[in-house]
Regions:
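N-terminally biased helix-coil "hinge/interface" segments that flank
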Residues: 1-219
Length: 219
């Protein structure tokens, strides 16, 4: 535990803004991860902590670790942004707390999204699939292909028989595996601003993007 305290101090000194904790068998017994979290809170109070047994309590330490790290990376910013939005809308008279669509096509309360930020990864294209299914139902179509093109990726989804297929092994468009329920999408790094680059003798496209200033909303 003394070594852990030293490591936490070093991370804070290096500018760490969030912690991700993933121990091998934590999905079966969370005691050690919870102890690590307690020590982190003692040494560095106020820094957000993502624990793998809370984020993705499944076998497969690599996928669980990646999922936890992604949550720790995007969690604080997501919580701040959605929290500001929720409070701003409430101040303008919105009676109910907002809900945010998730990668399963469902919705989560804004208050919970910051703790499980990874659950909204790829939720934009999934939201398009949900909307397409609704529209298809109104028009009498149950076989639909959707396409969602952004600045960094091109996402394709399929609706067959009015159902959304669950992805048994979801990956982000950067090739990172996540171990959470998600609607199946096929993603390629060919967005509107994707940059082609070489790494030795290999050609890559994205995920770097040239961006847009002003954005498409101003066109």
């Amino acid at each position: 535990e003394d070594a852990l305290r030293r490591s936490v101090r070093e991370l804070v000194a290096d500018g760490a803004e969030s912690f991700a904790v993933c121990l091998l068998w934590a999905f079966r017994n969370a005691e050690h991860e919870e102890r690590v979290a307690t020590i982190c809170e003692e040494v560095a109070p106020g820094i957000p902590i993502s624990l793998s047994h809370q984020i993705a309590p499944k076998m497969g330490e690599f996928e669980r670790a990646v999922t936890t790290v992604i949550n720790a990376y995007i969690g604080p910013l997501t919580q701040e942004y959605i929290g500001d939005l929720d409070r701003g809308l409430a101040a303008d008279g919105l009676a109910n707390s907002i809900q945010v669509i998730t990668s399963t096509g469902g919705a989560a309360r804004a208050a919970n999204v910051g703790q499980q930020a990874v659950s909204i990864v790829n939720s934009g294209p999934v939201g398009g699939l949900v909307a397409a299914r609704f529209l298809g139902d109104q028009l009498g179509h149950d076989k639909i292909i959707t396409a969602d093109m952004g600045g960094t990726s091109f996402d394709v989804g399929l609706i067959d028989g009015n159902t959304l297929e669950e992805d048994p092994r979801p990956f982000l468009d950067q090739g990172l595996p996540v171990t959470l329920p998600a609607v199946k999408l096929i993603t390629i790094g060919a967005g509107g601003g994707s940059i082609a680059w070489t790494d030795g003798y290999r050609l890559h496209v994205g995920p770097q993007s040239a961006g847009a200033n002003p954005g498409p909303a101003a066109y």
